UniProtKB/Swiss-Prot annotation:
Positions of post-translational Pyrrolidone carboxylic acid modification: 1
Source organism (scientific name): Vipera aspis aspis
Protein name: Snake venom vascular endothelial growth factor toxin HF
PROSITE patterns: PDGF_1 (PS00249), PDGF_2 (PS50278)
UniProt key word Glycosyltransferase: no
Source superkingdom: Eukaryota
Cited InterPro entries: Cystine-knot_cytokine, PD_growth_factor_CS, PDGF/VEGF_dom, PDGF/VEGF_growth_factor
Length: 110
């Protein structure tokens, strides 16, 4: 069965969608412990923009608290704890920044 163009287009558009992220990528300084689960589902911006010069970018964010099990491999002890993760609430296609380009506007020479 062929999926209609409008559905294909809508599903591929820039939007916040459930994405699996590794806890160790979000908390790289916590490498000495093991987390269960090792990744969590959060909303993150992804999708296609109408032009290759644009990138799907978050324009709204909030923090969610998720309960995770932390295991200490040396002592084999475990505990439940709450960890904070960023979720994207709104997304827009914005111009891609070139490598080495400053974040702010460029000053004009005088």
């Amino acid at each position: 069965q062929v999926r209609p163009f409008l559905e294909v287009h809508e599903r591929s558009a820039c939007q916040a969608r459930e994405t699996l992220v590794s806890i160790l990528q979000e908390y790289p300084d916590e490498i000495s412990d093991i987390f269960r689960p090792s990744c969590v589902a959060v909303l993150r911006c992804s999708g296609c923009c109408t032009d290759e010069s644009l990138k799907c970018t978050p324009v709204g964010k909030h923090t969610v608290d998720l309960q995770i099990m932390r295991v200490n491999p040396r002592t084999q002890s475990s505990k439940m704890e709450v960890m904070k993760f960023t979720e994207h609430t709104a997304c827009e296609c914005r111009p891609r920044r070139k490598q080495g380009e400053p974040d702010g506007p460029k000053e004009k020479p005088r």
